[in-house]
């Protein structure tokens, strides 16, 4: 007994009764007004109404030039009618293929003007064989022979617009041609990225503004025209090893394209058995890749990488595959298009404005020089001088083509060291 007393006397009593303090904290928390609940995740941007094409009876066409020269100009663009027009057009195309397979349009008639637009894209393909790549001894960087193709397309473009599309106004041809020519990639830097892909869509938008086709043709514009362009650019990238413009490397969605994932996710909304996780199933990719653009692009990306497995070479695609359904992915792709393409100054500072896609009042006036569609996006946002390219590439760092890595490995066997995660 004495020992128990002495032991208890030896233990110091706490100066503060923590049990009382804890009860006070609980009572205070109950008495405080409830904090407002966190808002739900940002909803996907809605598709704005697509305005009617302009009256062209007395229209003054203009050669497209860069007008986004500062953050202020970019903010003006983001609140402009042209921004709404671009969103309405791109999202309208995406909405037109929701729940539809690419092959659903296989036996459907194509309007004469859509056939003509498709013929222009096919005309570019015919030039590929005329400009073979130059042997660079296994180099994975851009092949200079691309410049010959670029120059040939620039020389032929006016003829195609006049003879195939039937556009006779030379200023209208000049305006539309600028977007088509610069949809191939950068002649100077030998690269290609989402800004060049956007140029192709703006060429299609110009033709819509010229009333060469209507919203009734949107599904065919995606399934016939865009898909043909996408496959054309794969051949261009494979032939000339175009470097990925503004690549985020392994942490990017894709080295070159964005829209296959937007259009492709829309196609798969409410699909009865293809889930987002199906992109890991090679059997489904092989069987369904020709029917759905998303699966086709994943199949292509995996085929050109030297390291196999999405989790290794495309962890962002791997992460997205964990989404509940395709509606979630479609919503996310729309948000990405707004934030990562139209919302990025390093991309949009090279966007071309003419009369059909006009600049907002108050935007900067660029020199009368045709720029070269530079569209690098960085984790360190910074603007580049509009006409200064001291290194021939952004920041002096060239990113090798991952398409080239696989191609050169196949050509030369195992003697070529693969780029990590390419």
Swiss-Prot record:
Compositionally biased region (Basic and acidic residues): 14-27
Keyword match Isomerase = yes
Give the top-level enzyme category.
isomerase
Q: EC number(s) of the enzyme?
A: 5.2.1.8
| Residue ranges, annotated region (Disordered) | 1-57
**Gene Ontology cellular component annotations, sorted alphabetically:** cytoplasm; nucleus; protein phosphatase type 2A complex
| Alphabetized UniProt keyword annotations | Cytoplasm, Isomerase, Rotamase
**Where is this protein chiefly located?**
cytoplasm
Q: Cytoplasm among the record's keywords? A: yes
Under the heading Gene3D superfamilies, the entry gives: 1.20.120.1150
List, in alphabetical order, the Gene Ontology terms for molecular function in this entry: peptidyl-prolyl cis-trans isomerase activity; protein tyrosine phosphatase activator activity
Query: Known catalysed reaction(s)?
Result: [protein]-peptidylproline (omega=180) = [protein]-peptidylproline (omega=0)
Annotated family: Belongs to the PTPA-type PPIase family.
Name listed for the protein in its UniProt record: Serine/threonine-protein phosphatase 2A activator 2
Q: Which organism is it from?
A: Aspergillus oryzae (strain ATCC 42149 / RIB 40) (Yellow koji mold)
């Amino acid at each position: 007994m004495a020992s128990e007393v002495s032991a208890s006397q030896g233990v110091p009593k706490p100066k503060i009764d923590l049990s009382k303090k804890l009860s006070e904290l609980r009572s205070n928390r109950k008495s405080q007004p409830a904090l407002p609940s966190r808002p739900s995740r940002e909803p996907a941007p809605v598709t704005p109404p697509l305005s009617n094409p302009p009256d062209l009876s007395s229209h003054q066409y203009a050669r497209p030039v860069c007008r986004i020269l500062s953050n202020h100009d970019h903010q003006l663009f983001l609140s402009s009618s042209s921004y709404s027009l671009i969103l309405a057009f791109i999202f309208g195309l995406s909405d037109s293929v929701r729940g539809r397979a690419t092959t659903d349009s296989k036996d459907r008639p194509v309007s004469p003007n859509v056939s003509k637009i498709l013929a222009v894209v096919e005309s570019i393909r015919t030039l590929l064989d005329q400009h073979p790549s130059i042997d660079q001894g296994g180099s994975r960087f851009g092949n200079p022979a691309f410049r010959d193709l670029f120059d040939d397309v620039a020389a032929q473009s006016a003829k195609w617009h006049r003879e195939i599309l039937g556009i006779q106004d030379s200023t209208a041809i000049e305006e539309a041609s600028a977007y088509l020519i610069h949809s191939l990639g950068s002649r100077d830097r030998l690269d290609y990225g989402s800004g060049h892909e956007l140029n192709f869509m703006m060429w299609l938008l110009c033709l819509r503004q010229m009333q060469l086709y209507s919203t009734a043709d949107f599904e065919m514009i995606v399934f016939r025209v865009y898909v043909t362009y996408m496959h054309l650019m794969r051949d261009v990238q494979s032939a000339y090893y175009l470097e990925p413009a503004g690549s985020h490397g392994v942490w990017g969605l894709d080295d070159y394209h964005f829209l296959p994932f937007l259009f492709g996710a829309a196609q798969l909304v409410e699909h009865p058995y293809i889930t987002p996780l199906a992109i890991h199933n090679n059997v489904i990719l092989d069987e369904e890749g020709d029917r759905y653009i998303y699966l086709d692009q994943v199949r292509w990306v995996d085929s050109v990488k030297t390291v196999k497995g999405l989790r290794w070479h495309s962890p962002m695609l791997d992460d997205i595959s964990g989404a509940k359904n395709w509606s979630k992915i479609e919503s996310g792709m729309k948000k990405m298009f707004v934030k990562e393409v139209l919302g990025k100054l390093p991309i949009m500072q090279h966007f071309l404005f003419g009369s059909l896609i006009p600049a907002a009042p108050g935007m900067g006036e660029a020199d009368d020089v045709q720029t070269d569609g530079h569209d690098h996006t960085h984790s360190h946002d910074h603007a580049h001088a509009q006409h200064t390219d001291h290194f021939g590439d952004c920041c002096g760092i060239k990113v090798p083509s991952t398409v080239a890595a696989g191609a050169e490995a196949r050509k030369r066997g195992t003697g070529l060291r693969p780029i990590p995660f390419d």
